[in-house]
């Protein structure tokens, strides 16, 4: 069986299983097994698929049919043009979160500063920001030790030196230092949300997704605590659910933040809300 036929059959299986991107999933999985990119697959589609690699590929397709995320199956995900290692201990970086990086860069025009990423996971946000602002000191924290180890390894593999990653339950392990910009993509899904039973999120850590009855528990905690760690004039920017923007703005305003505003993601949904402390 040649590569084109193998991909076509796999894509059909994935489509029947409910994948929203069956051909892409198949190409990414086969490219991973063969150690090639998707362009190579298009160019050499008439080549015979090696038996051993074919067996490995079909095992991955079977796992994907069961719903396992592609990023976990191949152990990597691209974010902001950076290739990041992933694991089941962390949330899978998503394209919409690049909106938070874009906002952070707009809020950080200076050559130097101090940046904090709360709940860093793979280190995606911290590393994307650090790659664009090499003069900034970038800190990422996560309460999961495996996540901190993974983020550290990603920084090393990408040769991004202006970062450090610490184990901390939100701010608990930080000293009296202050930051010019604090960002977070915290858990913001309500416990009863039916989407938790669908798609990739079924396999992602619940601790990175769920935040109480209304999904706002961690956002409230961050808003209340961040002021003590922001330098004068510093910003707090947070990702949240598309239907939470108004409530997050209210929480920021009630806590005393200024210049509160929400920004939209790639789909046109309000996804990031920010506020500033007094100078």
Residue ranges and their predicted role:
Residues 1-40, 49:
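Non-catalytic accessory regions of SAM-dependent methyltransferases
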Residues 28-106:
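Conserved AdoMet
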Residues 29, 67, 97, 125, ...:
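Residue-level signal for inorganic ion chemistry
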Residues 71, 189-192, 243:
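Active-site beta-alpha loop architecture of Rossmann-like, nucleotide-cofactor-dependent enzymes
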Residues 83, 137, 162-164, 258-261:
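Conserved beta-strand segments of alpha/beta enzyme cores
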Residues 95-198:
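Conserved SAM/SAH cofactor-binding pocket of Class I
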Residues 188-218:
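Mobile active-site "lid"/loop adjacent to the S-adenosyl-L-methionine
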Residues 213-276:
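Conserved Class I SAM-dependent methyltransferase catalytic core
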């Amino acid at each position: 069986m040649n590569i084109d036929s193998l991909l076509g059959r796999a894509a059909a299986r994935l489509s029947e299983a409910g994948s929203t991107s069956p051909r892409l999933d198949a190409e990414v999985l086969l490219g991973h097994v063969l150690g090639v990119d998707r362009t190579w697959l298009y160019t050499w589609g008439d080549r015979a698929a090696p038996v051993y690699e074919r067996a490995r590929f079909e095992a991955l397709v079977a796992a994907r049919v069961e719903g396992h995320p592609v990023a976990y199956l191949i152990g990597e995900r691209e974010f902001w043009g950076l290739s990041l290692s992933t694991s089941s201990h962390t949330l899978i970086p998503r394209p919409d979160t690049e909106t938070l990086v874009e906002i952070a860069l707009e809020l950080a025009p200076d050559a130097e500063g101090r940046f904090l990423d709360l709940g860093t996971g793979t280190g995606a946000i911290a590393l994307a920001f650090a790659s664009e602002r090499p003069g900034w000191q970038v800190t990422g924290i996560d309460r999961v030790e495996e996540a901190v180890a993974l983020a550290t390894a990603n920084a090393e593999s990408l040769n991004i030196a202006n970062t450090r990653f610490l184990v901390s339950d939100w701010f608990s392990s930080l000293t009296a230092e202050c930051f010019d910009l604090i960002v977070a993509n915290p858990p913001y899904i309500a416990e009863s949300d039916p989407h938790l039973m669908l798609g990739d999120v079924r396999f992602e850590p619940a601790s990175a997704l769920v935040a109480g009855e209304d999904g706002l528990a961690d956002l409230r905690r961050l808003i209340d605590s961040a002021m003590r760690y922001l330098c004068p004039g510093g910003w707090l920017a947070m990702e949240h659910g598309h239907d939470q923007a108004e409530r997050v703005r209210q929480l920021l305003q009630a806590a005393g933040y200024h210049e509160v505003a929400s920004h939209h993601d790639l789909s046109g949904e309000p996804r990031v809300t920010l506020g500033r402390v007094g100078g």
